[in-house]
């Protein structure tokens, strides 16, 4: 990714502001990436609507190093159809040819659009708009977010044909490279798109389509939570929980659209276990553990017996097993963990989910 200078960024922004009002009316309604008043949420909701209408087979196209492989000559020819100001054309071409610096050495760029600048996203959309127009001419339903492309059809046979013709156009006409290993044809439910996936369920004989988080995205989330709450973290518990809450809030701002109440119930319980294991590990000695536990709930009847049971169990079990031990859970209860800052994940999700679904559904109706 390139990091332009302040002057370069200002020039790029000026050029982008000139191009945007010209190309926005020309872009497809099925293009959602790097465009005003459009979002990834709108894209996945549109895909859900297509699936509900019977478009249950998908052509998932992955482009290899898309931003690095844009053909400069072809891109400039596309732009010249609508832009006739020679100064502007020269500026755009200079941006494309500006090169990249590696270890203090500038290398010329013969292809691609430098990432990290203000101009690159709109140039990338201008380039792939050629593919969007082809799909629309052929009557295909699709969603594209930058170089993430999902085309939906009604049958496997149609999907195979679309994959073949799309690959021919992208590689032959646009001179891009389709990643054969990651591009696939299959039932739309289960395929990953922008971190989400669709699922189908039957209720009272009626087929319903929903949105949930893709397993790969969920794994990344769990790995991040694990790293935040790891037993031997050097942060204080207060700092850890403050950061954890902020991370959950930011994560839900995007993934809160998904149906995942049960998933988050499970993860909340798992995260609380991680925190209990961290407490037990950091307290280290039986004496310190006894003292810490006795201070948590001083008015609890038979507290010393409960703490004693914890210490006896710990002789043969490590922190992770201890975190599931009922007597320890009764002291380091959910209520206690929340009192020291553990986030109410399910409550945060429900608030975020309702807000996102209502807002994005209104936006999709407006856009479509």
Where are these regions (language model features)?
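Non-catalytic terminal/accessory segments
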Residues: 1-368
């Amino acid at each position: 990714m390139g990091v332009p200078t302040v002057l370069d960024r200002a020039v790029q922004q000026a050029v982008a502001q000139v191009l945007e009002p010209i190309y926005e009316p020309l872009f497809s309604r099925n293009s959602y990436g790097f465009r005003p008043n459009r979002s990834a949420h709108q894209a996945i909701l549109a895909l859900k609507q297509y699936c509900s209408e019977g478009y249950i087979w998908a052509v998932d196209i992955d482009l290899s190093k898309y931003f690095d492989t844009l053909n400069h000559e072809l891109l400039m020819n596309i732009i010249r159809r609508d832009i006739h100001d020679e100064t502007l054309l020269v500026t755009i071409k200079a941006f494309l040819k500006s090169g990249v610096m590696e270890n203090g050495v500038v290398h010329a760029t013969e292809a691609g659009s430098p990432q990290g600048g203000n101009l690159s996203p709109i140039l990338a959309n201008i380039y792939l708009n050629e593919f969007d127009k082809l799909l629309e001419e052929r009557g295909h339903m699709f969603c594209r977010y930058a170089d993430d492309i999902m085309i939906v059809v009604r049958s496997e046979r149609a999907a195979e044909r679309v994959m073949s013709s799309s690959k021919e156009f992208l590689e032959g006409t646009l001179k891009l490279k389709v990643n054969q290993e990651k591009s696939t044809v299959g039932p739309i439910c289960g395929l990953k798109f922008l971190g989400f996936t669709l699922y189908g369920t039957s209720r009272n004989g009626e087929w319903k389509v929903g949105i949930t988080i893709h397993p790969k995205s969920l794994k990344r989330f769990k790995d991040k939570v694990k790293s935040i709450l790891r037993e031997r973290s050097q942060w204080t518990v207060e700092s850890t929980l403050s950061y954890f809450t902020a991370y959950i809030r930011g994560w839900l701002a995007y993934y809160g659209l998904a149906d995942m109440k049960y998933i988050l119930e499970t993860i909340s319980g798992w995260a609380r276990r991680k925190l209990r294991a961290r407490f037990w590990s950091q307290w280290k000695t039986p004496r310190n553990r006894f003292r810490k536990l006795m201070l948590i709930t001083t008015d609890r009847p038979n507290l010393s017996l409960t703490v004693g049971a914890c210490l006896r169990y710990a002789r043969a079990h490590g922190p992770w097993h201890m975190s599931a031990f009922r007597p320890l859970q009764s002291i380091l209860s959910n209520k206690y963990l929340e009192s020291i800052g553990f986030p109410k994940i399910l409550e945060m999700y429900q608030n975020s989910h309702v807000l996102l679904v209502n807002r994005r559904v209104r936006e999709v109706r407006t856009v479509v």
